[in-house]
Amino acid sequence: MCKVCKRRGNILLHPHEEESKKKGAEKVPAESSRVLPKDLRGRSGILLRMKERWYENIVLNIPHAGVRGLESIKCDNKVNLLTEVRRWTDWFTDLIFIPEKNDRIKHIIADFSRFAVDVERLLDDPLEKNGQGIIYMKYNGQQRYVDEKERTKLMAYYYDYNDRLKSMLSEHSLLIDCHSFPSDLSDMDICIGFNEDWSKPTDFVIDLVVELFKQHGYKVGINMPFSNAIAPETGYTYNSIMIELNKRVYLNEETFEFNDNAPKLREQLASLYSLLLRYSEEV
């Protein structure tokens, strides 16, 4: 298992592109003299100040909220499959993360279930040897059967999704990798992940995201319980960050109904996007 791979129950996951890591992260720009409207203090305890690099647009990547393709999956035990789907689908993250229409916020949603085709896997994914590459062949002791026609269709979707994601990005984009995880995996409410490479946001941006969630009363993990963020190669640099929501902060995991905090969380995320975009107009 590579150092980024995480085991979620019976599913081996590293949906964030380990292969994209390279030596030599971007140098952090010098601080500006402008101070944020609120007294946000970072991990070092100092007052957070403006950095030079901000964003012209935000791209929301929502890869694991879909359920399409489940009906065509051939496997040893369909009941066991549906148990895994229930647990590991990022239920309703599209409804939580996507704000009201904003021309500077784009989104892409995989409508296929990750159990049909996982659009965040790598073409030469190390998990392929465990039967959990782009097309999962093994999970929870079950064997899946895929004929060549079905494989061709699923791989075509994989390529199309990744091409569309890349087309949304520019050198001044912030890519937000949007996920959720079962509540029994961690006591963290929200996990913030990033790569230690060219795609890593400045410490200021990371601190801003973390501190805003903390101000709303959430317990925040940094690259824990999960780490990294998707960062497909495009030929230019941009920033990428992962936001993983503990399902308990927005969902009743038994009934699959939104809880009372769900609309608040959606507003809090929208406010975060606005803050990240607003400052790009001022620097």
Task: Name each model-derived stretch.
Residues 2-5:
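Cysteine-centered motifs
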Residues 15-17:
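Short hydrophobic alpha-helical segments enriched in small aliphatic residues
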Residues 20, 32-33, 44:
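Serine residues within intrinsically disordered or low-complexity segments
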Residues 22-23, 27:
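Polybasic, lysine-rich low-complexity intrinsically disordered segments
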Residues 43-175, 180-283:
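N-terminal catalytic or cofactor-binding beta/alpha core of small enzyme domains
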